[in-house]
């Protein structure tokens, strides 16, 4: 037999074998689908969706349908610790009973697990009562906008579990919440791991992008439009929103962005001073030790990746400072966020961005009052200002925010902290973004946001006002704030309704305005106007600079 004939025979045999294997695989998949369908039929009229990993069977509440604890990536454990997220395979039996939240990611307090890359999908109620197949088709017809929530917690704490998006979902949007790697398991640069040749350092940001990729591939099966995704987040989640705006790898993944309290001084300083992965590995930053020092502190003097991957997660957590920040790694983040915004080299989509009027009062309460050490005297105030701002800045801060001008020292420290850490840095970001994209700016300003001062049993010496994270309970009802009741008054409910309308209308159109709420115009540096979110109804104001000492003091730094 000639060589060419032998080759043809081999090719034909391979083709036959491939067809047999493909046929067997198809039969197997068909069998799994049949079993999954039977399982779904046996689940009464519970909502279902068919994803790339198999069938998910959710549950229905008064607020809509929910699909909880869906794995969006392989568990990042063992050899996958400190690697980019990998695709999850198939659900066992091709079916997932998606009725419970997945584990939070490992964090202080013994909370969570490394097997934590789960997401949750919340959809509006489906009107059809003709069985799961009709409901599934009904979802496909809708093409609803998708809101992708990134939780806060300093990149150290937090999870998707506390956020009930019922109010948002009732406005005909789909909400996705998820977990991403935190602490040194999510943000860690070390030379041996870098030497493995994969993208490294910003694992938490990689998880966020991987979850966005899952949404793009699967959300249509829940009734969502993969081309109408808005990312939104608060605090470190808002910071992550800015990081994704600046990331070339996130291009095309979303068409709108909302950052709540996401721009703060340490974050800006970190990015404007360009802490690269290489620097993080060898020298670290003012607030975070180098990767080499961290490895040594957890017992890996050999500096090997195998040693580090064998370190218990709890040991890594114990070594963490608070908060953490991402790195400029040359791929996911190719430049500082400040440079990206200033140059216009970012993902150019409409933005909502804002802060709360009394952001820093929360941190004063946590650091002083709630640990039994309130700032009561002028001397105690001077010491607290030096601790916050250092010896160089303390004298001008004390002159601009004198103890005698405030009812008590906690409020005075809260004022300088709010202006210097949150409000003025945020306005600088607003000004940069607004030169390139429509940027809708706000200040949440409900001075009576729950919980009330009286709820703390006399520990608080000042009202919290519109503190950091206070706005969350107006978007996510029932969220746990200090473990205390957070019932909204009738006027606060009106403000909540307006905020939910703005946020969801923005997700639908890229513009927060609708006929039922006060007009919200894009930010212009010439007018410096912003939307003041006050009860019962938002109002346009232009006194941000005078309220927060920005151009007179903080902008000079």
Positions of PLM-derived features:
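N-terminal secretory signal peptides that target proteins for export/translocation
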Residues: 1-17
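Non-catalytic accessory segments of hydrolases
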Residues: 2, 38-202, 479-499, 509-516, ...
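Bacterial N-terminal signal peptides
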Residues: 23-34
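Alpha/beta-hydrolase active-site loop
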Residues: 116, 198-220, 283-292
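Substrate-access "cap/lid" subdomains that shape
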Residues: 217, 243-246, 251, 260-261, ...
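Alpha/beta-hydrolase fold nucleophile elbow
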Residues: 223-234
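Glycine-rich nucleophile elbow surrounding the catalytic serine of serine-hydrolase chemistry
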Residues: 233-243
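Mobile gating loops/cap/lid regions near enzyme active sites that modulate substrate access
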Residues: 421-557
